[in-house]
Each structure stands twice: as C-alpha cells, then as structure tokens.
Amino acid sequence: MIKLYDLLVESKLRLNVPSDIKKIHKIFKKNGYKLYVVGGAVRDAILGKRPKDFDLATDAKPDEVLNIARKGGFKTLEVGKAFGVVLVGGHEIATFRKDIGKGRRPSAVDYTDIKGDVMRRDLTINALFYDMDKAEIVDLVGGIKDLKNKTIRTVGDAQERFDEDPLRKLRALRFAGSVGGRMDNEVAAAIKNDPSLKGVSSERIRDEFIKGIKKAKNTKKYLELSKNLRILPLILPGFNINLRFTKSNDYIVQIANLLRNENYQRVIDGLKGLKYTVQEVRDISFLI
C-alpha cells in the first residue's frame, strides 16, 4: 500500500491545454488561486494519448469559483455546487475536497488541500495533477511510476477504496485492461476476497463492463482476469457463462460469446433485467 507523502514527484509534461482553459487558469491565477488539470487528461497525456476531457481542481471554494468566472465573462452552472463542483465555460471545476459518506454521491463534502483531495481518488494513475504554471505533474502517490510499470494500484487501502464505491473494482479491471498491464497484488486480493457489487446500479455495471471490453488491449486477458477475481458472474448474474474467451473488442460479439451456452429467451429476459438497451438485446440474442 502506498501512503500519502511517501513520494512527491514533479515531472515535466507538455500538455496541450485548450485555449479556454488557459483563459480560465489566467483569471484564477490573477485572483490568487491555483487551478490544476486532474485525472484522466493527465494520465492519457503521459500515455501519449490525446485527452478528450479536461477536469479541473482548485483551492478556491465554489462561491469563489463562480464569482471569479462570472467576472471573467464565463458562463457558469451551479450543478453539483453542494458537493464542491461547478461548471465554468462547460468545464467541470471541483474544489479540493474530502467526501463524507460512501458511494458515487457522498452525503456531504469537507473542503481540504491538494493532499486531502488526492486521498479521495480511486487509483494512483488517476490521482495526478498538472500544474499549468510550471508545466509539471504533481504526483503524491507514485502514479507516474505505476503508469510506466503498467501497474494498477489504489490510493491508500484497496478495501477501503472499494467499500466507498464497489464500482471501483470494475474500474480497476478496466484500467488494467486498457494499459495492458497488471493489477497490484493487494488490489487483486481485495477484489477476489470481496467481489460484491452491492449497491451499484445495473446501468453503471453495464456501462463499465462495456467500456472495459471496448478499451482492453487484450480482451481475452481482461475477461480472464474478471473470471479469476470472481467478479465476472456478478457482472452477468444468473447466466451460464462460456469461459472460452475471444479477443474481440466488439462488446456485442463478446457478450454474445460469453452467453453462447444460454437459452435464447433467457438471454433476452436476463439482459433486459440488466438494463441493456432494446437494440443491444436484439443484437446479442441474434448472435446466440
């Protein structure tokens, strides 16, 4: 387990930040606040991918964010303000925070500093902050090293992170597949010992599973890992799953292959119950 403060890495990175974010950053800096690019955009840039979405984090409180942005002429939305998140110019800006309560939507938040914000994140590779002033990555948990080694590791105790939101188990699997790497032993053991997805909606499980298939460098290995960690039967509960995996990244083809031993009508009824769309159910059942 990596503990906060074990490691602080400041590594240079040339991140092509959109011009409107640069403008937002400029007015935050003018008003004495920090603004970082966080999470997936930083991870993808390190991997040599072009980031699609840019999430931002700041030490400014939500009301301060809104005030600064409006004075700067940016459109704002207060959706999520109670949880420290607002939209500025279409970009999500979150105040450094600690979640109170479990699950995807905490009951409340406490505001904190960058170190506290890092500790609420799921995986080390998603806990990287890009400092636009210095063109540097701030890494408090060894995420850069884990990315280079293609190792999936949680921030802090794995069981605690998964207890906060069990969907994180599927996210860990997805990222292990998408980077073509391995799962840290503690993370793998935590999932295998308690693969439960209790409290997670069928829609979220479906969406995460589909993303896992589509983004995996080797879908066969992704599914084998899901099976070995005893979580695959909870992704497709009630089915007799075919364990002869293929490498296709087409999730329709892949799910049809997983259910090839099942009765046609059971597939239709089961997938409907798991919130697959009418078209998805039709396409998958057609291939059975």
What is the predicted role of each segment?
Residues 2-288:
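Catalytic cores of the polymerase beta-like nucleotidyltransferase superfamily
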